[in-house]
Design a protein with these regions (language model features):
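AMP-forming adenylation/ATP pyrophosphatase catalytic core
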Residues: 126-349
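ATP-dependent adenylation/nucleotidyltransferase module used to activate substrates
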Residues: 1-157, 168, 178, 184
Length: 349
């Protein structure tokens, strides 16, 4: 019998993942990560995925299944590796995805550390993705979920071979409707609970307000400029804008204007036409290849530059410095600094 830690958010997905793992006969405990105190960032407890209500939902599910339940306090690490990184990225003109950092530094790092300390064998999560071992390649592969509408392989791109060897994703072969049916059948209190949509520590979606409150610093106004460098007006501070943004610019023009670039060095926001947002190439650093050690030669693949972005045909190659270069068959809109690139070879990453 192996021993598993179930990472539980209080939602239906992780609850069903816990149930399916328990049904294998393995020893299980449920664990919720305490990431921050809501009052510290000025939000009500019921508005985030880290609320007391969520903890109680997870505890209730574990009680019904007869497994022990714990709350691990990772708030200090969350502040350093997720919230601080989020703020720093926005202040430098990038658009980060903090959910990926949370997976990287908390769920699949800090939780792994706790797993080893408790002498457990693997971690279970409610992500919609699949892990399979390829004997020919002698590597674990990360594959897309059966339910394309819920696939979360994009947010797991950073997983190492060691981590892939010690995780289980029971929902990868199920559809969301099936997961809810299982939860209802077993009387889970969260069977019809809505999925979380927003960044947990910015539930109202106002990133600029959060950053100002979190840092205690007011935004520094600067210039809107066109693609030729001509001043068009004043902006409220670069943290208020992201690439591709059209609304809230307050600049009169004969045609629609969009944010085409953000320069933290000059504190300028570049505005242009929609056509100015399209580019065919990008470079990516901090590369994590799952299906191979490195790209020895150019490779045809499908890539996506955002979580909900459709996969696009492209060719990729890696230079000696480890940087990944990607050229898309068709120009892509708003390739944004700070975002993650995920590529697929057939259904493997």
């Amino acid at each position: 019998m192996r021993k598993a830690i179930i990472a539980m958010s209080g939602g239906v997905d992780s609850s069903v993942a816990a149930l399916l793992t328990k049904e294998t006969g393995d020893e299980c405990i449920g664990a919720t990560m305490k990431l921050f105190h809501n009052e510290d960032i000025g939000v009500k407890r019921e508005k985030t995925c880290c609320s007391l209500d969520d903890v109680e939902d997870a505890r209730n599910v574990c009680y019904r299944m007869g497994i022990r339940y714990y709350v691990f306090n990772f708030s200090e690490r969350f502040k350093e590796d997720v919230m601080d990184r989020f703020v720093d990225a926005y202040e430098h003109g990038a658009t980060p995805n903090p959910c990926i950092d949370c997976n990287r530094y908390l769920k699949f790092d800090k939780m792994f550390q706790r797993m080893r300390e408790l002498e457990y064998d693997y971690i279970v999560t409610g992500h919609y993705a699949r892990v399979e071992y390829d004997e020919e390649k002698n590597r674990y592969l990360l594959k897309k979920a059966v339910d394309d509408t819920k696939d979360q392989s994009y947010v797991l791109y950073m997983l190492t071979q060691e981590q892939l060897a010690h995780i289980s994703l029971p929902l990868g072969g199920l559809r969301k409707t099936e997961v809810r049916e299982i939860a209802e059948k077993h009387g889970f209190v969260n069977a019809r609970k809505h999925d979380s949509q927003d960044i947990c520590f910015v539930p109202d979606g106002d990133y600029a307000k959060f950053i100002e409150q979190y840092t205690g610093r007011k935004s520094i106004p600067g210039d809107f400029v066109d693609t030729e460098g001509n001043i068009l007006g004043k902006h409220k501070g670069i943290i208020h804008y992201t690439l591709g943004q059209r609304r809230g610019l307050g600049i009169p023009a004969a045609s629609r204007l969009y944010v085409c670039d953000i320069s933290p060095k000059t504190n300028q926001v570049v505005l242009g036409n929609n056509e100015d947002l399209f580019h065919s190439e990008l470079t990516a650093t901090k590369v994590n290849l799952i299906s191979c050690e490195s790209l020895k030669e150019p490779m045809r693949l499908k890539a996506k530059i955002r979580y909900r972005h459709p996969e696009q045909e492209a060719v990729a190659w890696q230079t000696e410095d480890g940087v990944l270069h990607v050229r898309f068959d068709k120009p892509q809109r708003a390739i944004t600094r700070g975002r993650q690139l995920c590529y697929m070879m057939e259904i493997s990453l």
